[in-house]
């Protein structure tokens, strides 16, 4: 099964939205990586991983960049996200 990783921070309403979207889609098996306490280093890493995005949340499937909360919501609503996570 493909692995979903989501970079978040604790006080981010968009990150809370992602958690809700994933729960509504029945997706419970994902890794949440908090940037709290190491924001500068993690934001630099996000810039490198995404090709320029430094904001959170940002999502990856098997190290392939998927997008932000809007992208995840769109993929979850269409059912595509579940298909992307299937083995």
PLM region spans:
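Conserved short-loop catalytic and cofactor-binding motifs
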Residues: 30, 34, 47, 69
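Amphipathic alpha-helical interface surfaces
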Residues: 14, 18, 42-45, 68, ...
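Structural micro-motif
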Residues: 50-60, 69
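Non-catalytic, surface beta->alpha helical segment in thiol-disulfide oxidoreductase systems
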Residues: 61-87
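Local sequence-structure signature of Cys/Sec-based thiol-disulfide redox active-site neighborhoods
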Residues: 1-33
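Short, low-complexity, polar/charged sequence segments that are solvent-exposed and flexible
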Residues: 24-27, 49-52, 78
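Thioredoxin-like thiol-disulfide oxidoreductase module
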Residues: 35-54, 83-87
